[in-house]
Design a protein with these regions (language model features):
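Exposed beta-strand/loop interface patches that mediate assembly or binding
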Residues: 1-73
């Protein structure tokens, strides 16, 4: 049987740190939680640059782990 996939949630945050290989540390606006995130494939393909201090939209995986930056605001 096929189970329903859990919905992914998205939050807005600010980039606080940049690491090699398009990894970033993002602090969410609602909570004071910091998470490790990576760039989505389309953002890598179009070479969209993310700088420290940028507001970004992050998609959070319901199973934990890293978040994915899907939009620069």
């Amino acid at each position: 049987m096929i189970e329903k996939q859990k919905e992914k949630t998205s939050v807005v945050g600010v980039v606080t740190e940049a690491f090699p290989n398009t990894l970033f540390k993002v602090k969410t606006e609602k909570g004071d939680e910091e998470m490790l995130t990576f760039l989505s494939g389309k953002m890598r393909l179009h070479r969209i640059r993310i700088l420290i201090g940028d507001r970004v939209e992050v998609e959070i995986d319901p199973y934990g782990g890293k978040g994915k930056i899907i939009k620069r605001l």
